[in-house]
Amino acid sequence: MDLSADHVEEVQNVLNAMQKILECPICLELIKEPVSTKCDHIFCKFCMLKLLNQKKGPSQCPLCKNDITKRSLQESTRFSQLVEELLKIIHAFELDTGLQFANSYNFSRKEDNSPEHLKEEVSIIQSMGYRNRAKRLWQSEPENPTLQETSLTVELSNLGIVRSLRTKQQTQSQNKSVYIELGSDSSEDTVNKASYFSVGDHELLEITPQGAKAKTNLNPAEKAACEFSEKDITNTEHHQLSIKDLITTQKHATETHPEKYQGISVSDFHVEPCGTDTHASSLQHENSSLLLTENRLNVEKAEFCNKSKQPVLVKSQQSRWAESKGTCKDRQIPSTEKKIVLNTDPLYRRKELRKQKPACPDSPGDSQDVPWVTLNNSIQKVNDWFSRSDEILTSDDSCDGGSESNNEVAGAVEIPNKVDGYSGSSEKINLMASDPHGTLIHERVHSKPVESNIEDKIFGKTYRRKSSLPNFSHIAEDLILGAFTVEPQITQEQPLTNKLKCKRRGTSGLQPEDFIKKVDLTIVPKTPEKMTEGTDQTEQKCHGMNITSDGHENKTKRDYVQKEQNANPAESLEKESVFRTEAEPISISISNMELELNIHRSKAPKNRLKRKSSTRKIPELELVVSRNPSLPNHTELPIDSSSSNEEMKKKHSSQMPVRQSQKLQLIGDKELTAGAKNNKTYEQINKRLASDAFPELKLTNTPGYFTNCSSKPEEFVHPSLQREENLGTIQVSNSTKDPKDLILREGKALQIERSVESTNISLVPDTDYSTQDSISLLEAKTPEKAKTAPNPCVSLCTATKNLKELIHRDFKDTKNNTEGFQDLLGHDINYVIQETSREMEDSELDTQYLQNTFKASKRQTFALFSNPGNPQKECATVFAHSGSLRDQSPRDPLKCRQKEDSQGKSESKSQHVQAICTTVHFPVADQQDRTPGDDAKCSAKEVTRVCQSSQLRGHKTELVFANKQGVSEKPNLIPSLSPIKSSVKTICKKSPSEKFEEPVTSPEKTLGSESIIQSAVSTISQNNIQESTFKEVSSNSVNEVGSSTNEVGSSVNEVGSSGENIQAEPGRNREPKLRALLGLGLTQPEVYKQSLPVSNCHHPEIKRQGENEDMPQAVKADFSPCLISDNLEQPTGSRHASQVCSETPDNLLNDDEIKENSHFAESDIKERSAVFSESVQKGEFRGSPGPFTHTHLAQGHQRGAGKLESEETVSSEDEELPCFQQLLFGKVTSTLSPSTGCNTVATEGLSKETEGNLESLKSGLNDCSGQVTSAKVSQEHHLNEEARCSGSLFSSQCSAMEDLTTNTNTQDPFLMFERPSKQVYQSESEEVLSDKELVSDDEERETGLEEDSCQEEQSVDSDLGEAVSDHVSETSLSEDGVGLSSQSDILTTQQRDTMQDNLLKLQQEMAELEAVLERHGSQPSHSSASLTADSRGPEHLLNLEQDTSERAILTSEKSRDYSRSQNPESLSADKFPVSLDSSTNKNKEPGMERSSASKFQLSYNRWYMHSSRSLQDRNCPSQKEPINVADMEEQQLAKREAQDLMGSFLPRQDQEGTPYLKSGISLFSHEPESDPSEDRAAEPAHVHSMPPSASALKLSQFRVEESTKNPAAAHIANTTRCNLREESMSKEKPEVISSTERSKKRLSMVASGLTPKELMLVQKFARKHHVTLTNLITEETTHVIMKTDPEFVCERTLKYFLGIAGGKWVVSYFWVTQSIKEGKMLDEHDFEVRGDVVNGRNHQGPKRARESRDKKIFKGLEICCYGPFTNMPTDQLEWMVQLCGASVVKEPSSFTPDQGTHPVVVVQPDAWTEDAGFHVIGQMCEAPVVTREWVLDSVALYQCQELDTYLVP
């Protein structure tokens, strides 16, 4: 049409206006599925559902703020017709004018997220930025009708991409390059965009993938130079890829890179959104040009590949180009060349992308964040769709859809390889090569996103065809590939070309078979096929083929074959392949990017897809995968899709496998890092990947092929034969679970691992598909480690893949179990990833996802199974984190190994209960797993080592074996480990001397065994539901913790989180089995304990490592005292994750209880433990009171567990404990002393690690550390628990012998410090146990002593008497209902008052007791000497580490207090304020000082609170579920305290009280005031001389003192501060802080200006939080509740004035309503009245008055209130004046001017009936006469106003 520019502009303006009218006010895009609200506003259905789902309760219309509900939404079909017609008009306008519709992005965003928009818009987007980019892309999209055609397919594939788009303009770019990179989601798209936009420079940029991401665009030449060097690394192959990349780049320049080359705008667009990915892509492109020029051979290869790939590539490209009219011509012209180049390029790009991704992991993560959030909805939609269509897609893809899909995949793979060659070509190719299915999945997933954008119809269309299955496979494979690529990068540098050629040929040969087999058998054939396929084709197939190696490898190969056959006539195929290629490349590149990047953004999109599971996984992958920045995002989506496919069939199984694969990959990454630990930290590896990004990428790709090629041969050649068998079996089951994903993972992992094996060792093949596989993985890692840094990378990839495969295999073996396991693994991965990436975001998402997954996977079988697997995964996760820090690498390998072993064993475990015990101990788990089926294979490798010994020994040997494998790793990694700060560092340290023993025990066992133990305990201790919830919470909190303490605490946190996950899931299934196991064999207890000791020892060793590495050896050597180890490890587990922490004690408790046949306590403890972990995590993460209550309940249970544990220890390990202690602390002469040292060391080691974590958390989240603190609490709690458990063990020993008990108590001070948090829990559980203890006084005393040792630290928290009463009442309460979580509700106000009175009596008794104890304590000093010696024995360690440990413990206590405060907050206002105060103080105080001071303060507060009913209430609820439990207990305690039972109960009660740290601190406060050593000495002596209870109390006090003092010795300043704090706390007892005061003395409130309804709410609030509500304000009143407006402005009332004058909290009624809403007493600071209607709306008078009580505004004034006053009695006015510091005079004649005071007469003139009255007064007394307003204004503002204004005339 010949339209004048003006006319066109007019039409465009009209269309723009129409579009604006038809766009959704929320997303500002054209309304997709219009829904109308009651208020007649139109929104997108998706936007409204998102809005409605965000809030609980009614949501508001964004436009008119009217309430809207889901029911009120009505679909508006007519409006949707309008939108459709508008889009048609716009499209026609674009076609007619050839102009992009400026605002077409609005509809394109949703509908036209097609590549054409991306392509056309790419250059614009490049220059304009992501948002503009997206718009321009969309604008350009409509211009190309063909593009829109592809757009539908693209949109289908873009559905996954759409998330990216929403997240960032990633989707837009993806859409632009959708044709080429449909497979890549947001992150890959971003990469592609980046690389494409820099396509002009991309040749040069490509050269600098490592650190030149940012520089890429700036220095093309430089980058080219760098790229050349990189290319030199992978010369031949890299050049091949380079040529391909160049040609592809040119093609993409036309197609996808409008920015770089207008034709390539799409790819460019893809690359751009990723920022870093952009650079990486650009680097790739540059590299490809350089490579092109450099390597003609590569071009030849590429041509050869083109012959196989060209048809698909050309077809897909041609179809894309045909579809995208504008780009079509450019593309078609270079079609042949480009095809060839693309074929070469994909390989090149794949490698390049790999390099590039490592190069740009940082920015992709950054960019991921936004896309992640924006993509959330899209991903969710896609996930749902996947869930619905997964099974269909899976079967479709595997069967009929297989050939077509595979062809498409091949096309998609090849084309995307070419396109992605720029942005994610490396990644995509790698992903494709490793995951052909993944490519298809990606394609489909992407298609889904596009469809989502376009509409549900499009959604359905594309999805059916290829997104779901390929995406899932692709995701899994991407993960595998990500790790895998790293590995092949190294291994295949030289063989890459040859292998690529071989693979190319093999692919064509094997394509059909693979295609057909793709589900189960494809892996084996795929590997050879890939090998046989051309080098370039193989490289291409590294995308498609490796992807096919899963399920789609065959498809891809067939596709390639078909493409080869139909090079010219393949246009129809081309279209298919183009479509697939578009989707696949995107998915591949995205997957690769996700894999490699593991960045938040990539996490985010996939997280959405995977519901956060991928998010966490990706962070794990991030460590290894940081090279592929874009990939992780897409990988997440595809993985999610992949898992969704399988998951659709197996609900969580699929997602779990995906997660597992991610986790596995992370593990693999870590293993890789371990393998590459040759002084190459993960960072170094990343750098090398960045610098050698292309060569390594090539290597990675080649190994992908190579692995595929050698996978089968190596399988046969190596012990991998066994693994091959496993592989086959697992393949089948895996395919069943996630046909493509599993196959992809397995095949890929196998192939890669085999290639690695062939290159490195045959161990890798073993790790592919079985327990052996997992072991092999570890083994492979070892050789790889021995090899060069590149080999470690390969090893990492292999390990990752192996882990994935293992997981998949495990899934298959126990499909139900597998699902749970996968879920757990996914959780672990997700949570680790989250830690690595945006932990808050991810953790939140992960929590939801975990909840969903765990809800879905409640089968005990796979729970059990997943438990072992999860520990592995946990280890893997931890190690993945370590992976980034090479220093953690040693642990990683061990953990990975064990993880894999555990996974393999996990399968067995599902079969055998014995496996549960195995789960308890990783080595055992490995052994047991092998025992069932993999035993033969395992025995070949590890079983021989592990199986040789009994289960106990098996644990040890297994650990040793794993260690042996990892030993080679460890030595190399020891230096690297040091960078890992606390957790890894410690491992490293012990690694030198105890590397063989300890690394296995401590790293592997600590992480793996611990997780397993934790999970086993979790099963026992936690209910399934609780566990799943807890898992979510735990992973969240852990994730948060991990994020803040990424380096130091990340591994620990990750371990804890994954352990928690494991525990949670296994807990469900495992509870029965675990119980059976625990009951089954306390042989297993030994194993169990052994595993615990290993873990525990590991931690103590870690602690000692810095101090002595001999200790860890001793610990390991002293496996016989497994109990101590066990106890230590259990705390370690707890430390790792609060869930683990609580679970570990529960486990012990369960064991002991089983021994004691105390199922009540056991189950209760279990539940509570689960609740605790759950709540701790939740509370930590969310700061929710309920979770905290659960936490405390769990804590209480843990206490019980600890106690039971001690009892068990008494029964089974009294002698062993000393041995263990001696072994640990050989230097210490007394066994108790050594045990103390051991405990302390362990605690300290944990503390150190935890401290790092806590400190990092503190620094990052000091006051918002509700979550972090909780995490700290959980960590610290774990530490404390470890200490407590060890103490418990020791105390058990003490139970056996009082001497030991005394010594234990003596020891406990160390432990006590760490235990405080733990002991709180312990004392609670011990309260539960106390019922048992009460059974016999002797036993009670012993247990009390044990508990003393464990809980005397707690006694620090509570006075002895209080502790006793607490214990007694708590015990009775536990008997009545340990789970009396609602007891506070049950108790009436009268009862509470009675309890409070009892508390007061108790306080007095406690004070007396304290005095007696102090006297006794000062007398005996020999015990203190021994105690001091003991303390000092470990103190040398402690001195170095106790400071950290104290800090960590204090921090933990602080955080625990904080959590407690939160929980108590909800439970009781009294409790909350103190807790809040202490937590606030803790947070405020830096380092140990803060934590210790806060801890002491808290301890004191708690003690005081304990004494004062409210204190106990607060603490009990926090410690125990119900405050009322504490109240009732206190009542009972008060009664019992009167009795002498107090003495016998004192230890236990003290322990129980200790959790509060009340009596302990109170006593402790006094004792610290006195000479610490003297007090300490006195107390120990007293322990002997006094009754057990009294001595226990004294001991606990002493211990608190001692622990404080030992740290004081180590860190005098800190201890001094703590002591000073404690002293000041004890001195300040009455007025600790307003909040403390509130807790200490019951809160008292008055309300002013409220309606009767509101008053009822206040009454309800007061009842809930044990607050006294009165009608009149009194001296005791603490809070004045004012009716205010939303700005906290109130009317002035008498209570308002009196509240301000009295310095009370004058808070808004909103404080009550919000506190009720959130279920806890909120901080008043946020609700304090700011002003009033008279004196100003923000004068801050109440705050000023409250904060300056010492500065009285009327000080020095004599005021006479004369005459009548209205609205208030004169005496009230006089009281007000008195409160403000004035002296009141009744008559003006009574003024005393000589006193230096200033007289003032206050009158109210309008109240006088006679005029003359008040005028004479001033003359009579010569004092100024002012109106009452002067007083009121001065009080309201709390500033003495000038009298002149108020003088009476």
Curated annotation (Swiss-Prot):
Main localization, broad class: nucleus
One Pfam entry name: zf-C3HC4
In-chain residues carrying the UniProt-annotated modification Phosphothreonine: 1389
Glycyl lysine isopeptide (Lys-Gly) (interchain with G-Cter in SUMO2) cross-link, chain position(s): 301, 339, 457, 517, 981, 1073
Chain positions found as Phosphoserine: 114, 395, 398, 423, 434, 691, 711, 720, 982, 1002, 1138, 1184, 1211-1212, 1274, 1323, 1330, 1336, 1382, 1418, 1452, 1518
Source organism superkingdom: Eukaryota
EC top class, as a word: transferase
Cellular compartment(s): Nucleus; Chromosome; Cytoplasm
Pathway given in the UniProt record: Protein modification; protein ubiquitination
Entry's Gene Ontology cellular component terms: BRCA1-A complex; BRCA1-BARD1 complex; chromosome; cytoplasm; nucleus
UniProt biased composition (Polar residues): 1370-1389, 1418-1429
Any one biological process term the GO annotation gives: sex-chromosome dosage compensation
Zinc finger (RING-type): 24-65
Maturation and modification: Phosphorylated in response to IR, UV, and various stimuli that cause checkpoint activation, probably by ATM or ATR. Phosphorylation at Ser-982 by CHEK2 regulates mitotic spindle assembly. Phosphorylation by AURKA regulates centrosomal microtubule nucleation. Autoubiquitinated, undergoes 'Lys-6'-linked polyubiquitination. 'Lys-6'-linked polyubiquitination does not promote degradation.
Catalytic function, reaction form: S-ubiquitinyl-[E2 ubiquitin-conjugating enzyme]-L-cysteine + [acceptor protein]-L-lysine = [E2 ubiquitin-conjugating enzyme]-L-cysteine + N(6)-ubiquitinyl-[acceptor protein]-L-lysine
Modification N-acetylmethionine occurs at: 1
Family matches, as CDD domains: BRCT_BRCA1_rpt1, BRCT_BRCA1_rpt2, RING-HC_BRCA1
Molecular-function annotations in GO: DNA binding; RNA polymerase binding; transcription coactivator activity; ubiquitin-protein transferase activity; zinc ion binding
PROSITE patterns: BRCT (PS50172), ZF_RING_1 (PS00518), ZF_RING_2 (PS50089)
Quaternary data: Heterodimer with BARD1. Part of the BRCA1-associated genome surveillance complex (BASC), which contains BRCA1, MSH2, MSH6, MLH1, ATM, BLM, PMS2 and the MRE11-RAD50-NBN protein (MRN) complex. This association could be a dynamic process changing throughout the cell cycle and within subnuclear domains. Component of the BRCA1-A complex, at least composed of BRCA1, BARD1, UIMC1/RAP80, ABRAXAS1, BRCC3/BRCC36, BABAM2 and BABAM1/NBA1. Interacts (via the BRCT domains) with ABRAXAS1 (phosphorylated form); this is important for recruitment to sites of DNA damage.
Comment block on domains: The RING-type zinc finger domain interacts with BAP1.
Function recorded in the entry: E3 ubiquitin-protein ligase that specifically mediates the formation of 'Lys-6'-linked polyubiquitin chains and plays a central role in DNA repair by facilitating cellular responses to DNA damage. It is unclear whether it also mediates the formation of other types of polyubiquitin chains. The BRCA1-BARD1 heterodimer coordinates a diverse range of cellular pathways such as DNA damage repair, ubiquitination and transcriptional regulation to maintain genomic stability. Regulates centrosomal microtubule nucleation.
Record protein name field: Breast cancer type 1 susceptibility protein homolog
Native source organism of the sequence: Bos taurus
